[in-house]
């Protein structure tokens, strides 16, 4: 039986969330539940056929069960819809909308990465109306220095992959799961991804791509909320909607998402480049693109 909040408590929570929204706070994070926390006992109603009231009967008279009253459904306000309302949703220009998200991100101190040596926040770059979006895991040293995703050796390989598709880097949008460089170029921790990814979801809702390519396991697992291997994740499309936000465009209700290897991995194991090209060809077919003819 699903639990429902007391209507008065629900209205109070909705009012509190609106209050935070008016202060410019739009993202909320769940506290981990203590293992010692006890379960709240929820009374379970008996089946109506079992509900009967004892009453005096004359000899030979049978007792008949009294039908249980059926409560009218309660129409409750969905407080989580309040959380989903973002300031950029009232702006039709995607450039301005992305700027609002960047300003909301600010000089972010929401997770430990801000005090572990980052130089700057690496937000995202590219065409704000792109049909194709690439999402990596996080900035490296070169990205941290230049403030733009995928500008180092892995970025050069990504540029070549994009050119092989017959388009230029400027035609796509590129971002990462986390926007601060993890120390030593380590993989982002799960809590860091959970803290930063709401801003990425908002970027996706503004750009409204037709296809997202998740580069590497961290990006794929975070976006899809799946803990599967790359072998299991690759080779197919997933229906994707950015969690926690809604697009202000009624004609956009999510996109396709494909998974391929991260360019940094391909630098370490060039034998997998052919597999990555298969993934990109699948994306090209979905977008109606044709590979450019080889020149001699």
Residue ranges, per PLM feature:
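Charged, compositionally biased N-terminal leader segments and the immediate start
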Residues: 1-12
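Terminal amphipathic helices with adjacent charged low-complexity linkers/tails
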Residues: 35-38
């Amino acid at each position: 039986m699903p639990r429902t909040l007391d209507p008065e408590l629900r209205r109070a929570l909705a009012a509190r969330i609106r209050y935070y929204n008016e202060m410019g706070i739009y993202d909320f994070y769940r506290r981990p539940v203590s293992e010692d926390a006890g379960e709240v006992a929820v009374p379970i109603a008996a089946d109506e056929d079992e509900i009967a009231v004892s009453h005096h009967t004359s000899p030979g008279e049978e007792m008949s069960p009294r039908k249980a009253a059926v409560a009218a459904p309660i129409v409750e306000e969905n407080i989580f819809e309040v959380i989903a309302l973002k300031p950029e949703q009232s702006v039709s220009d995607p450039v301005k909308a992305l700027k609002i998200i960047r300003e909301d991100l600010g000089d972010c101190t929401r997770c430990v990465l801000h005090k572990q040596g980052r130089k700057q926040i690496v937000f995202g770059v590219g065409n704000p109306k792109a049909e194709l979006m690439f999402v990596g895991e996080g900035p490296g040293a070169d990205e941290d220095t230049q403030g733009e995703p995928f500008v180092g050796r892995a970025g050069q390989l990504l540029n070549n992959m994009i050119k092989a598709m017959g388009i230029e880097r400027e035609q796509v949008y590129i971002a990462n799961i986390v926007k601060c460089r993890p120390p030593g170029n380590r993989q982002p921790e799960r809590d860091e991804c959970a803290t930063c990814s709401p801003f990425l979801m908002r970027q996706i809702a503004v750009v409204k791509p037709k296809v997202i390519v998740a580069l590497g396991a961290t990006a794929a697992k975070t976006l899809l909320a799946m803990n599967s291997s790359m072998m299991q994740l690759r080779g197919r499309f997933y229906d994707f909607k950015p969690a926690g936000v809604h697009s202000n465009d009624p004609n956009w209700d999510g996109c396709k998402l494909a998974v391929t290897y991260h360019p940094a991995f391909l630098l370490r194991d060039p034998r997998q480049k052919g597999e990555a090209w298969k993934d990109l060809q699948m994306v090209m077919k979905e977008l109606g693109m044709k590979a450019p003819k080889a020149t001699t």
